[in-house]
Regions:
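Secretory-pathway glycoprotein ectodomains that are cysteine- and/or Ser/Thr/Pro-rich
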Residues: 1-279
Length: 279
């Protein structure tokens, strides 16, 4: 972080400001990644060690986003984000077939919604809606990529060991107390862009769920049914990709040794982004 860049951050009113001479991570657009700056004078070796967790989290998020296939997925699914106070839709995402079956905005007569939400003030309580328009049950996984790049599981949380699929025609909300999700999703933390990824599959994500069960058990009963931060995000995402690969191989697609593949007939991944702003 140079003195010139520090002055630029001051003009942009970025908080907290990093120390001049500190090591930090930046996006391709030269934007500071929140929470990545260290202390002034830190060695490159120490900086790399300190940032290993965040680098893994950013890599995991990137790998998941590479699976986004709303335009090519053959499943009919729709997802949306709404405020709890007033139930206002602020963003939605859907597959091509999901749009034909009726998106949330179409059903409510709302126009102009995209997968990019309006600016959401800190402290706003929101929830996410997912509609299964298929004739078969679907398994739903919802991940949050926070402003600082941390990867967090919003659903399933397996508070009661439940990983039941969403039945045909069913709409669920997240968080949902009936699914063991005992939390309220309030937009908090640092300002910036956050993203929610909704992954739907026709087969259960066995390996990923097993890892979530281990993480949930380690946290104890007091945190049961609350979002799970992935302390080893690369391991979690590789488990997820393995599940998607196994589901694809079981669908009769031609497989290549050593190459993970995803069958768009078996899964769909959608993205909803929103900007966290100050109150």
């Amino acid at each position: 972080v140079t003195s010139v860049y520090y002055q630029q951050l001051q003009k942009l009113k970025v908080t907290p400001l990093p120390e001049i001479g500190s090591l930090a991570l930046f996006s391709l657009a030269a934007d500071l990644i929140p929470g990545s700056a260290g202390i002034s004078g830190e060695s490159v070796t120490d900086g790399v060690k300190r940032l290993q967790g965040k680098l893994k989290s950013l890599l995991a998020a990137r790998l998941v986003k590479l699976t986004l296939n709303a335009t090519s997925a053959r499943l009919s699914v729709a997802a949306a984000m709404e405020t709890v106070d007033g139930g206002q839709l602020v963003a939605e995402s859907f597959t091509v077939r999901g749009a034909k079956s009726g998106s949330f905005s179409q059903n409510r007569g709302v126009r102009g919604l995209t997968s990019n939400a309006q600016k959401i003030k800190q402290g706003t309580q929101v929830q996410f809606l997912v509609q299964n328009n298929e004739l078969v049950p679907l398994y739903i996984t919802v991940l949050l990529i926070s402003v600082d790049g941390t990867l967090c599981v919003l659903s399933p949380l397996l508070g009661r060991g439940d990983n039941s699929p969403v039945t045909p025609g069913e709409k669920i909300q997240i968080p949902d107390p009936n699914r063991g999700e005992r939390y309220k999703f309030k937009v908090e933390g640092e300002t910036g862009i956050a993203e929610v990824l909704v992954i739907t599959t026709t087969t259960p994500l066995t390996k990923a769920v097993e890892l979530l069960q281990v993480l949930a058990a380690e946290r104890g009963d007091s945190l049961r049914g609350t979002p799970v931060d992935l302390t080893q995000p690369d391991e979690a995402i590789f488990s997820l990709l393995d599940d998607l690969d196994e589901g694809s191989r079981g669908s009769g697609t031609n497989s290549l040794p050593g190459v993970r593949q995803i069958d768009t007939r078996q899964m769909a991944a959608m993205s909803i982004t929103f900007e966290v702003v100050g109150m």
